[in-house]
C-alpha cells in the first residue's frame, strides 16, 4: 500500500496568510518564532527562529459536527510552498510519538483505529489502517496536546 502525507490546501492557507478568519472567525495571531516546535502545516517544515508565523484555530474537516475537532495550528506568515506527495513522514514530525487515527468517509472517527504510535512506526500504522475499508483517511496529531499535524491518504 502506498500512502502520502498531505498538507493543508494552499487556497485555505493563502486566505489565512492574507488575514482571513480562522475556524472561530478571528484573524490569525502573528508571532515571532523562537525556532522550537513551530510546525507549519502547509510546507510541513518547522518555522525557523526569527521568522514571523501565524497561530490560529483550524478545523481540518469540511463541516462542523461532533467529531470535527478544532484546535490551534501554526503557519508561516509569508507564503510557502505546499508539501506535495510526501511518502515519508515530514520534517515537522520530530516528536517521539503521535496520535494516529482513522476517519471514515463521513469525516467521523472510526472507533478502535486510534493509538499513540512511535514516529518511526507511523507509515506502517497508516498502511495497516488503510487495509480497512471503513478508513477513508488518517490524521496525525500531537500525542501531548492533540494538535492536528497533517493528514495521510492513500496514494
Region annotations inferred by a language model:
Residues 1-17:
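Extended boundary segments
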Residues 18-118:
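Conserved mixed alpha/beta catalytic, RNA-binding, or beta-rich assembly cores of soluble enzyme
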Residues 66, 72, 128-129, 155:
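Short, charged/polar low-complexity linear motifs in solvent-exposed/disordered segments
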Residues 75, 126, 149:
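Functionally constrained cores in energy, signaling, and assembly domains
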Residues 101-137, 141, 154:
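Short, hydrophobic/π-rich interface segment
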Residues 142-147:
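Short Gly/Ser/Thr- and Asp/Glu-enriched loop/turn motifs at secondary-structure junctions
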Residues 148-155:
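C-terminal edge-of-domain segments
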Amino acid at each position: 500500500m502506498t500512502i502520502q502525507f498531505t498538507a493543508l490546501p494552499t487556497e485555505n492557507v493563502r486566505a489565512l496568510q492574507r488575514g482571513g478568519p480562522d475556524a472561530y472567525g478571528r484573524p490569525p495571531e502573528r508571532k515571532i518564532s523562537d525556532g522550537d516546535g513551530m510546525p507549519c502545516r502547509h510546507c510541513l517544515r518547522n518555522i525557523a527562529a526569527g521568522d514571523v508565523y501565524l497561530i490560529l484555530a483550524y478545523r481540518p474537516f469540511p463541516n462542523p459536527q461532533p467529531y470535527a475537532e478544532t484546535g490551534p495550528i501554526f503557519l508561516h506568515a509569508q507564503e510557502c510552498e505546499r508539501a506535495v506527495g510526501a511518502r515519508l513522514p515530514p520534517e515537522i514530525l520530530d516528536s517521539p510519538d503521535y496520535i494516529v487515527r482513522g476517519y471514515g468517509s463521513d469525516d467521523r472517527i472510526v472507533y478502535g483505529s486510534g493509538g499513540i504510535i512511535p514516529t518511526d512506526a507511523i507509515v506502517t500504522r497508516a498502511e495497516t489502517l488503510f487495509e480497512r475499508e471503513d478508513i477513508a483517511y488518517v490524521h496525525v496529531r500531537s500525542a501531548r496536546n492533540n494538535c492536528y499535524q497533517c493528514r495521510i491518504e492513500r496514494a
